[in-house]
Amino acid sequence: MERIFNEQLEYCGVDYFDYYLLHNMGTNVYDKCQKYDAFGFAAKKKAEGKIKYLGMSFHDMPELLDEILGKYGDIFDFIQLQINYVDWEQPNVQSHRCLEVANKYKKPVFVMEPCKGGTLVNLPDEALKLMKDYDPDASAASWAFRFAASQEGVVVCPAGTRSNG
């Protein structure tokens, strides 16, 4: 891990990272992070000042997020979650419940996929008509961003569309 971390610093031309993510945290990645003590390594880099703010992008069920934050929450400064109105109650994503877990541990949330890769920008005509009837000046993207950004605990909601329609 040390070699890869140093290569990342060198590649970016920096002495430290302002924000650093443990990426794609789910069951398989979590198991590997525990096996190779990636959490301890990241905590060490924070203590050395090589990482200012440590986060993780999470891609699994809320129960696993609760387990991770229960064990390692003290090292994480933020959590990146997939939050949009389609995935809010989806059984295989459970954005709403994951956000509740992040809030339980008082972790600021950075949103990923607020427009679901552009899907929520290019809506079917029937859905777009409902939105336009309610607010003619609001775009489909603005509805998606307002939904994600208005959730409790959300502090960053970047654009992430693959298509701007």
Regions found by a protein language model. Name each.
Residues 22-165:
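Beta/alpha (TIM)-barrel catalytic core signal, keyed to glycine-rich beta->alpha loops juxtaposed to Asp/Glu
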Residues 7-30:
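Active-site groove signature of glycoside hydrolases
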Residues 1-3:
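Glycine-rich anion/phosphate-binding loops
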